[in-house]
């Protein structure tokens, strides 16, 4: 309302002043026509204009004092009031008001001052006192007349619902200062805390608390909360300035792109930002909106999670740059600033700095950029523009950016500590272009070639040859599990020889290799003669067999040498040796079952026939294989059950050992006397599998006879191969078949002792489960005589 509007009741003289002026400080009469009514007290705590212009508020504490008294110095007080108003107006003109703080104060926000109080929709004033009524000077009759006169003279046509306060100041409407839920609650709390009483019955404030609108002279922008009563004050444009939050928040900024959270994060492909100069000297600026930009993609994995896709913030951190997988010649600006991707959780808070050229980029869609953060180096921007293949039309490969004074690795990373004149070292991937070096299968040293059928070094080759030809009886001082490597291969020759046999080394492999080489040379010579004389037809005397023979198949399926695991450091005993032999025999039976199933034609027999043949012949196979190992390794003088268990004469002298060892030594001595070859041994071993059948015959008897005759012929071929076309072939065939017949007597003696130790529980000799099952099934058949021996010669 107008400050000059009279508040005096009709028929009453003017009062020159207020009685409160002398006792309570300076009194200003805002309304010159006010008579005997409200006076305004300006607190003495703000005596100067300078004190009134503090942090967030330029207002003074205004207190109302309703009294019935009057003073005599009204004119002087009015002059002081006018002077102070003029000073305040000049100060407001000199200083531009802070809109954001004014709006915050008008909404009742706490701005952080120590003496500022949140007062709902009211402004915050220094806490000097509260509104109160002077005791003993109250005239409610005059107050009622002043309020009645005020209500008649201050009606507003625009807003008929607005009300005026008892002080004569217009109350701000809800349209000008909308109330939020928090403001209303805060106002109610302040009313309760500041409400005074006079005599315990009179309330200090009316229901609609009046405030002073000291911000009406300020000009609000179109986005002010006063324009919309339904809008939240927190959405005011006065408090939010996008240009203040990020320098890249422009509408046309090329860095602000849309992206999806399920897409890969790939670098931005930007246009050439190098300023182009016309002939006249003017600079041609390219429009960012005309550039087709790809989407900024984000990716999500176990460690990196992007929460706000596509938001990029630019921070000025100084001359920092980085090498990236881009090509071209130009760099953005003279001074690179850090570019960080929001939402990426990076350890240590590091940022990715793009130092790239965008003249002409060739970025494949399935490749990701490689960043290399480089510490700041004072290098001019003109030096940054130099890279390999510079020029606007030239393209550099991915990650080929180069800087002067640095060598670039082939994988795209640059090393700031290398000299520029030193060539870059090759990458690790390109260094190892060839295959890895081949290692010896025995000692893991570098292999020199394939020796005796196995890839070994020269040392193991010589050792194996000397061990076989010298017929050494190696014994391990430990548990037959010594480590054989390049350094410790000479510590234990027994374990080294065992490892050679496990690898498959064989002296016969060298002879076979020589034969194959001779056949290849002969074939090459025949083809050369044919090419020289095309009209001449040559028929070779014997063509090499292209199909594998039965003997070659038997060589392939031959079981490997097994180890007994016998501890030679413990004193020997007959019980411990026999138990170890039984355990070794059980594993050898399992290997024999696999070997028998691999024999050509044997799996065509009935399954019961296969099991019957194995039950009848398992001791034949064990004894004959033992004789062969003893013949090859000790010339038939020792029994080589395993590389780690060799029965010498001392062990043969143990109780219950000599008689059984004597039968087994007979086999090895016969093989030594006849000088049986490896092919002959393989055929004879197969025939021993087919040497015993039940008396009633097999279910597949005819097929069994055919298979047996096939391997008899194969034994004849092995004899011819060894002796050649000589008259002694039949004699040798007789000798070998005679040895096969003698195996029945040897096996009968061994089985008799085996059955005895199995049935005699007092000896406490252990048998493996599979071997015990076979013996249990075989004992009744032998006791009943239900066995038919297939002999070559009649007795």
UniProtKB/Swiss-Prot annotation:
Q: What is the effect of changing residue 260 to D?
A: In strain: SHR/OlaIpcv and Brown Norway/Crl
Phosphoserine: residues carrying this PTM: 46, 134, 155, 162, 224, 232, 246, 287, 327, 424
Q: Which family does it belong to?
A: Belongs to the nuclear hormone receptor family. NR3 subfamily.
Q: Which gene encodes it?
A: Nr3c1
Where's DNA bound on this chain?
440-505
Q: What is the effect of changing residue 488 to Q?
A: Loss of chromatin specific function and reduces chromatin remodeling. Abolishes interaction with SMARD1
- Changing residue 501 to P does what? Abrogates DNA-binding and transcription transactivation. Abolishes interaction with POU2F1 and POU2F2
Compositionally biased region (Polar residues): 151-170, 185-196
Q: Where is the composition biased (Basic and acidic residues)?
A: 1-15, 173-184
- The covalently linked position for Glycyl lysine isopeptide (Lys-Gly) (interchain with G-Cter in ubiquitin), per the record, is 438
The GO cellular component terms are: centrosome; chromatin; cytoplasm; cytosol; dendritic spine; glutamatergic synapse; membrane; mitochondrion
Residues modified as N6-acetyllysine are 499, 511, 513-514
On modification after translation, the UniProt record reads:
Acetylation by CLOCK reduces its binding to glucocorticoid response elements and its transcriptional activity. Increased proteasome-mediated degradation in response to glucocorticoids.
Domain of life from the UniProt record: Eukaryota
State the organism named in the record. Answer: Rattus norvegicus (Rat)
| Lineage, broadest ranks | Eukaryota, Metazoa, Chordata, Craniata, Vertebrata
Q: What is known of its domains?
A: Composed of three domains: a modulating N-terminal domain, a DNA-binding domain and a C-terminal ligand-binding domain. The ligand-binding domain is required for correct chromosome segregation during mitosis although ligand binding is not required.
Where the record annotates domain NR LBD, the positions are: 542-776
In residue numbers, where are the NR C4-type zinc fingers? 440-460, 476-500
Give the Phosphothreonine positions (modified residues): 171
Question: Looking at the record, which segments are called Interaction with CLOCK?
Answer: 504-795
Recorded protein name is Glucocorticoid receptor
Residues covered by region (Interaction with CRY1): 550-715
